Amino acid sequence: MYRTRSSDEVTTSTDLTSSSDVATSVDPTTSVISSTSADPTTSADSTTSTVQTTSAGPSNNIGNSTLANSTTFAVSSTSIDPTSSSDVITSTVQTTSIEPTTSLVSSNDITTSTSLNISVVISTSTDSTSLIESTTTVGPHASSSVAGMYRTRSSDEVTTSTDPTSSSDVATSADPTSSSAVTTLVDPTTSVVISTSVDQTSSSDVATSVDPTTSVISSTSADPTTSADSTTSTVQTTSVDPTSSVVSSAPVDPASSVVSLTSSYPTSSSTVTISANSNGSATLAAQTTSIDPVSSIVSSSGATTIISSASIDPASSVVSSTSSEPTSFIVSSTSVYSTRPSGPTTSTDLATFSDTIILRVSTTSTSQDTQTVSSSLTDMVSSTGSADLSVSSIQRSQVDPSTFAVSNSPVYPTASTGSTSTGIPIASESLSLSRQQGISATSSSSIVTLTPVDSASSSRSSATSIIKPNMPVSSNDSKTQSSVSVVDAFQSTKSSYPSITSADPTTLASENGLVGSSSSAHPITLDRTYASAHASVTDIVSRVTDSTRHTTLVTSNINIQSEVGNPNYSGPKDTTITKQSAFMTSPASTSTISNVQSTASVMNHSIEDNISAAASLESVSGTSTKDYSSQSSAIHYTNSFTTTTTNAFITSKHSIAAVSTGAITSSASISLIMEGSANIEAVGKLVWLAAALPLAFI
């Protein structure tokens, strides 16, 4: 489980007869008394300690009772508020001075608090009278609420000496079992903390300078004998409007079928993350997302680099690094498909609109604040596009590990046989599964008990709006946990329960149509011909435990087939698309498009998802099989899509690993958080949710 240090490792005396360890050491020169008690029955450190420094007079040697010779004493404490949901660390330093001539007592309290969710240097204060300096820092284990086990070291593990001439504190803590020493120097004039960790077994030095005025980087020493501790530093170079970075609205003119898009938010965002691995290397991940405000096409690019060494300039917060592996990786792809290999040109009359172009856009974004990865998939239908469109492009991203500059270039472009114009988002769905692991602290009688906390959650949202003559259907829902939904055309994105709408094929229905994933509605006149549809979903989840470390994290395969027949259409009836994408330490990606024939007259949908995940201490696999079937009273031309996507991530211990898999309307995000060396089997229930549409497009 987690390594626990008891008080007797760092103090001079231990009471072995009592049920709890009580360690007390007295320095006869300075009469400094340190006392800390720990509960030996729990695997927790005593994170609250009180150090009282008293100058005793030589005439009576009675410490506190003789106030005339006791000029100063200081009491410092550090505690975790168990009632606060934000895991606030509070450090209080009280310095009391007594004037021996006038017996005037003056007290000075310095209280600083910080949230465990951020990595900053909290406070560095120096009392010029007593020359007692208190420095409270939060280590990188508290850099994220989902980072797992938080390590809090009590002050009795550190021996502090004060140099009256330089007013600087030199603190050294030593772990006798790991032979590691940590030296922290505090410059009281500049309040700059310089921490040096020396692993005497491997002779490797790690130095991190922190500028408390900018509060950008924080660091802590790692235990070199175990793999449970590591150092993590996070740098975010670009800020973006956190409200939204997507197109806010996409109104449609029903007469001309022209889409006008407006955006009130930035159309590009960039995120860079650096994670230090336990083997001494670092992982750099860069993510850039941009949105075309005209076509609403979302492109995402990024790269992951293994850095052998990295240093941070405390003045400019610039990371300098050297890498033994390439910094160029294929990380994202955007494919544009046509529902028909050939056909007549597009008509602007929506009622006779005979050609529809589907733009499949897959995006993946990383939230720097919550350390979770989410993915989304958007299907676009062109309102004024031409036929014979078949385009697949893959982005290669170059990342400069020193400046975090990201440059993108296409790798495998396929020439387009047609052109696209303004697109209308018709389908968007996202699924996320996250887990949080941490500790909660309760304090009683100077004993802090740490309790592991484990929680998992899943959520899913989707919005679909298909605009096609004689084939109007929309499915929109937003739920949490498992669900199956087939909803009425053009419901809001917050629909919670499924419903089926049947209409007379000869009747024209005027609906308030939802275009895209926004919650606003736009009137669109549609001709309904489908009378009935039904869907069934079967979910199977299994878990496998594995002890493999540093291996491929997740592999996902998604196959989608969709067919609907049209006896009046004589051209090629199927388009098969096979795609593979690999996210590894070397570029790997293939894209193949071919045409096949089909004569199916009944629409069938089948989705098979296979997910397997392997983290540093476990692997999880889940299988979800979904079968959709529907029959229609009006059959149109045939379309068939088969999309296979394989994503593989290489991860290291203590890093947050995620995978996003997407098919035409299926998108998933899985976040696995590992910390410590605990053999944790439960990663959280993998929940798949799907919306079934009784038409050719999902």
Curated annotation (Swiss-Prot):
Note down the stretches annotated as region Disordered. 1-65, 133-183, 197-274, 455-480
Where is the sequence biased in composition, kind Low complexity? 9-56, 158-183, 455-465
Q: List the disulfide bonds.
A: none
Source taxon at top rank = Eukaryota
**What up-regulates or down-regulates this gene?**
Induced by pheromone. Down-regulated by RIM101 and inositol.
Q: Which GO terms describe its cellular component?
A: membrane
Protein name stated in the entry: Pheromone-regulated protein PRM7
